[in-house]
């Protein structure tokens, strides 16, 4: 049986909470200072006041703090992905058609779904949900896989959008113009990166085209550094029984005992075969995951 999406939603919620907690903790030494003092808009003025009050910040803290001062005036229009760069799928596309199209074009971790035209976005699908549907041989349209998004105007402040995303518990906002047409999109990762810089998310493992590629309904390609839990969530099968390894590469090395050569195939379970597609003499780089049941049934 495949795992419920409740665990995934809970994991995302916990991850977002941890990120917000980390940002709050980062500024705890100066929290009281801001409550008692009028905050100057000039960054260097703030640093001078902190120095006078014997408050210290690391270089990373200074960079994040500078970004926070800048972001307060930024709007969605400053960072959104424009309409021309949006990748989306028609609502009428069925899973069988999508399985075939994936062979030619790799989807993003989150892909928008529209009804009729891009001006009528109905939500988005996550690539992990899509592969689960393939693995369980689900048929029909994409409606049952769609997750909700929110609507925002280009003029909305970024901090207001971040608050709204947390309240609505969604990761994507569709930006609309004055006529209601789709102008662009913004993800929660875009917002956080405006504050802390580029994030290498060890929980989601940046499930983009660099780390996870769906080839068809029985095959995916994974970066060997992707955590085992990510694969477990996708296929709904427990692969890790202890803390001996964390990544897909660690799983393979534990089973084989050394770095296998390219082309080596390892049976991880009755239903899962891993093939090494990229490796050096010292490390595993990339693997191909095959679901045998799906192959045999096809």
Curated annotation (Swiss-Prot):
UniProt xrefs under Gene3D superfamilies: 3.30.465.10, CBS-domain
GO molecular function: flavin adenine dinucleotide binding
CDD domains with a match to the protein in the record: CBS_pair_CorC_HlyC_assoc
Superkingdom classification of source: Bacteria
Pfam families in alphabetical order: CBS, CorC_HlyC
Entry keyword Repressor: no
Record keywords: CBS domain, Repeat
SMART domains in UniProt: CorC_HlyC
Domain CBS, chain residue ranges per copy: 80-141, 145-202
PROSITE patterns, alphabetized: CBS
Family note: Belongs to the UPF0053 family. Hemolysin C subfamily.
Further comment: It is not know if this bacteria is hemolytic.
Protein's UniProt name: Possible hemolysin C
Naturally occurring in which organism (per UniProt): Rickettsia canadensis (strain McKiel)
């Amino acid at each position: 049986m495949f795992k419920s999406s409740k665990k995934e939603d809970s994991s995302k919620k916990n991850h977002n909470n941890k990120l917000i907690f980390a940002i709050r903790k980062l500024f705890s030494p100066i929290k009281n200072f801001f409550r008692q003092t009028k905050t100057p808009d000039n960054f260097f003025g703030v640093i001078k006041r902190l120095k006078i009050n014997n408050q210290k910040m690391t270089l990373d803290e200074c960079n994040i703090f500078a970004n926070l001062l800048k972001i307060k005036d930024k709007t969605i229009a400053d960072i959104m992905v424009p309409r021309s760069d949006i990748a989306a799928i028609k609502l009428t596309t069925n899973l069988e058609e999508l399985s075939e199209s994936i062979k030619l074009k790799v989807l993003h971790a989150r892909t928008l779904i529209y009804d009729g035209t891009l001006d009528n976005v109905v939500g988005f699908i996550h690539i992990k949900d899509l592969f689960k549907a393939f693995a369980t041989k689900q048929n029909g349209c994409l409606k049952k896989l769609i997750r909700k998004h929110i609507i925002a105007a280009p003029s909305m402040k970024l901090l207001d959008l971040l608050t709204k995303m947390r309240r609505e518990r969604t990761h994507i906002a569709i930006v609309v113009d004055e006529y209601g047409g789709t102008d662009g999109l913004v993800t929660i990762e875009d917002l956080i990166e405006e504050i802390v810089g580029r994030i290498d998310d060890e929980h989601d493992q940046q499930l983009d085209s660099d780390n996870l590629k769906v080839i068809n309904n029985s095959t995916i390609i994974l970066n060997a550094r992707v955590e085992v839990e990510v694969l477990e969530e996708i296929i709904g099968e427990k692969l890790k029984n202890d803390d001996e390894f964390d990544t897909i590469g660690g799983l393979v090395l534990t089973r084989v005992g050394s770095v296998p050569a390219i082309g080596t195939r390892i049976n991880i379970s009755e239903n899962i075969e891993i093939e090494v597609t990229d490796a050096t003499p010292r490390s595993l780089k990339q693997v191909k995951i095959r679901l045998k049941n799906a192959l045999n049934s096809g």
